[in-house]
């Protein structure tokens, strides 16, 4: 049978399976592909194919992640599953696999365990909007009261981390049964997919957000003016648009785009994902620098103080060999810019060990255009020692 091209007209959503080790995350991922494949909405992926997740390098950090994709009647999903707990922490904190929602898998035989709690906390800290619970292995629990108890504990845990514990769907099923084609458990997998379709919100597409392009390079064309190049992160820009240059010492200088070029062709507009050159009226070459951002006027502010969730690399990952203490001053690589900043640790935290994840406050030495959810790397002498994302703007 010919391979069909994935239908891109359906809205695209990124999700993942999270939860404690051996509770059935990977088996559930395999079961979803098996059940949807019968409806022609997925390709079957076996447990082993998913479990042997390839290594990926994301901002200098190696993470094992398996990616599968499938569709429901209304949506197209990209689904991530990680083999090890450390991979989850790295993935969620660095935003390597951005999640619009997640399936938290909990075994009915155990109930919530330490990593169940830790993954829900991480989901909260990196602003995953909603979770759906899949209570797995219910086929090997004889006592219905046990199932009620696990459900109650999960709802309390969700409430504690400010997910809607009362209304979050909890589906009781058997991932193994679903993967093996037992109709009773296959129906539960479909019930789970319906819950995901209805409970997890559609993300706002990058193109619908306001225009922002980090500057990568700048050059001048004699007789025409200054061109700033970069990859448009969000939104659209058209010839004739008024724009503002932000960050470093730009002081919010305004200009007008007199041309949008891509591969030496003149375009009417550039949109999210395009690598373009913007011809800027009335701007000298030395007024725009790599690391600044170009936006529509008054949409983005430069900031110097933010809160962030970070993962610090282990020695084996090429990170630091020693812990760092309060007031540590590394470089933060934000978009296209390296900027020095000072780290303040949370109260009661003396130091941070390689391999830890921690919430920190960062004070940058000069203002940088940034926003919640923005990812960055932490560097020291040109090598990556950590990564994270901004969770709150302070000033």
Swiss-Prot record:
Its EC number is 3.6.5.3. It comes from the Bacteria. GTP binds at residues 19-26, 81-85, 136-139. Residues 60-64 are annotated as: G2. Keywords: Cytoplasm, Elongation factor, GTP-binding, Hydrolase, Magnesium, Metal-binding, Nucleotide-binding, Protein biosynthesis. Residues 19-26 are annotated as: G1. Residues 136-139 are annotated as: G4. It holds the Pfam family GTP_EFTU_D2. Residues 174-176 are annotated as: G5. Residues 10-204 form the tr-type G domain. It catalyses: GTP + H2O = GDP + phosphate + H(+). It is found in: Cytoplasm. One of its GO terms (cellular component) is cytosol. Residues 81-84 are annotated as: G3. Signal peptide: none annotated. One of its GO terms (molecular function) is GTPase activity. Mg(2+) binds at residue 26. The keyword Cytoplasm applies. Belongs to the TRAFAC class translation factor GTPase superfamily. Classic translation factor GTPase family. EF-Tu/EF-1A subfamily. Monomer. HAMAP family: EF_Tu_B. This is Elongation factor Tu. The lineage of its organism: Bacteria, Pseudomonadati, Bacteroidota, Bacteroidia, Bacteroidales.
């Amino acid at each position: 049978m010919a391979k069909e091209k994935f239908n891109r007209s359906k809205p695209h959503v990124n999700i993942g399976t999270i939860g404690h080790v051996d509770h059935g995350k990977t088996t559930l991922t395999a079961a979803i592909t098996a059940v949807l494949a019968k409806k022609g909405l997925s390709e079957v992926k076996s447990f082993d194919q998913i479990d042997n997740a390839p290594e990926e390098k994301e901002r200098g950090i190696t993470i094992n992640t398996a990616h599968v994709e499938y569709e429901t009647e209304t949506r197209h999903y990209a689904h991530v599953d990680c083999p090890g707990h450390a991979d989850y922490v790295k993935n969620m904190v660095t935003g390597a696999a951005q999640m619009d929602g997640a399936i938290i898998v909990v075994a009915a035989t155990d109930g919530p365990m330490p990593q169940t709690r830790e993954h829900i906390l991480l989901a909260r800290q990196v602003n995953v909007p909603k979770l759906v619970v899949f209570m797995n292995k219910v086929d090997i629990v004889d006592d219905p009261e046990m199932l009620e108890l696990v459900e109650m504990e999960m709802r309390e845990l969700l409430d504690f981390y400010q997910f809607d514990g009362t209304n979050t769907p909890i589906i009781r099923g058997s991932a193994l049964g679903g993967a093996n084609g037992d109709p009773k458990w296959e129906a539960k997998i479909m019930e789970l997919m319906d819950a995901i379709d209805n409970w997890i919100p559609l993300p706002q597409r990058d193109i619908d957000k306001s225009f922002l392009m980090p500057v990568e390079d700048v050059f001048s064309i004699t007789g025409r003016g200054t061109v700033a190049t970069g990859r448009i992160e969000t939104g659209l820009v058209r010839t004739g648009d008024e724009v503002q240059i932000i960050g470093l010492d730009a002081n919010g200088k305004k200009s007008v785009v007199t041309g949008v070029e891509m591969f030496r062709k003149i375009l009417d507009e550039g949109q999210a994902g395009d690598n373009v050159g913007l011809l800027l009226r009335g701007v000298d070459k030395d007024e725009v620098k790599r690391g600044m951002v170009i936006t529509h006027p008054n949409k983005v502010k430069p900031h110097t103080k933010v809160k962030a969730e970070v993962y610090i690399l282990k020695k084996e990952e090429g990170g630091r060999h020693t812990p760092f203490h309060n007031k540590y001053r590394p470089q933060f690589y934000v978009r296209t810019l390296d900027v020095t900043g000072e780290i303040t640790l949370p109260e009661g935290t003396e130091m941070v060990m390689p391999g830890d994840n921690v919430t920190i406050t960062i004070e940058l030495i000069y203002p940088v255009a940034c926003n919640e959810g923005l990812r960055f790397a932490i560097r020291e002498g040109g090598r990556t020692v950590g990564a994270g994302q901004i969770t709150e703007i302070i000033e």
